Amino acid sequence: MKDFSFEKVKMWIKQELVLTIALLLGCVSSFFNTPKMHYIDWDVLAVLWALMVVVAGLKTVKFLDWTAIELLNRCATYKQVVIALVGLTFVSSMFVTNDVALLTFVPLALVIGKTIKMDMPRVVILQTLAANLGSMFTPPGNPQNLFLYAHYGYSALGFFKVMLLPTVLSVIYIGVIIYFKRNHPLQLELPALEKPDRKLTTIYLVLLALNVGAVLHLLDKYIALAITAIVVLVVNRKLVKQVDYSLLLTFIGFFVFIGNISNTSVVSYLRDHVLGTTEGTYLAALVSSQFISNVPAAMLLAGLTREADALLLGVNIGGLGTLIASMASVISYKLFAAEHPYQAGGYLRMFLFYNFVGLVLIGFVTYLACIVNYINYLDVSQFRELSEFLNW
């Protein structure tokens, strides 16, 4: 019985590795510094919970599935099918997060792959790229954006201005890959889903808009949370159980850890000498994301740097690269490997190729256009201020 329990614990730790690390860091660091309640950003947790419960509602009415099938049945060529699958993933990830977009549209792609001949590894990889790159354009697109948006007090316009260039570059990169795909006519006849309940769908879409508005500072977060909680408890209280509470606990663990170490000498050194520059922060975010994933990287580095734009760009573009750079990539890999176990190795090789090419291209162009130009702007501004001072 003890062995069985130990195996269950091992399996849980394996499944919730990031949560385990976050809680360990939070607990261990608390032995050296007494944690305080204000370390935890309750605003972020409130918005995250509300968004997750609303997205769970949209999943229950199969709104995204129905929309996808209606669109796909209108496609007349292979390339149109690929564009539809990838495009739906890209756009939806901006509002329902990259994880949910992949959990919705990758299984649909795998089902289509059983009815027509498709290059399934490439299609799923393109969907993964679309989810990770599309989600970076909006604050609610992924957890790291939601956290950084609140942590640094971004305005909606300021956030979109920072993320516009890498998003455009992402569209170009994915578009070029699809453009060189062979094309041929086909006719999909996917079984139609029952039309989603209009009343419930409208309620969940209104709640989604309400909470996106709260993220963008158009509405008080706790008013949006209260409305969402009341409506969900009345309409379908089972949705409360479908929230990813492990993600919320992960955030709490990192909040406590960051608060505990924020005033240590090591952190002060890193803040002043490594992450005190725009370039250093950008590169640190890119590299650390490859090894610990971009959500933990964002939360850890945010406590060490004031270079908000560089960190935001770095952890989002850093979602490209290794399989664990973005946990959303792990989701699509598991879905594909479960359906095509003998192609898992080939999938990984192709995944790494497209991801690292995208990381280098998008990362380098963004570095030149945003990071270097920003540094040059600072240099010019400082020189102008010095000249004015000397003339005075």
Which positions does each model-derived feature cover?
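Hydrophobic mid-bilayer segments of alpha-helices in multi-pass membrane transport proteins
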Residues: 4-31, 41-53, 202-210, 218-233, ...
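Hydrophobic transmembrane alpha-helices that form the pore/transport pathway of multi-pass ion
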Residues: 87, 91-136, 299-313, 341-343, ...
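Interfacial loop-to-helix junctions that mark the boundaries of transmembrane helices
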Residues: 8-14, 35-44, 156-165, 194-197, ...
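Flexible interhelical linker loops that connect adjacent transmembrane helices
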Residues: 4-6, 69, 180-205, 237-241
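Membrane-core helix-loop-helix motifs of multi-pass transport proteins
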Residues: 117-120, 124-183, 188-193, 334-364
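C-terminal transmembrane helix pair
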Residues: 160-174, 283-379
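Transmembrane helical segments that form the transport core of multi-pass membrane transport proteins
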Residues: 39, 56, 61, 65-71, ...
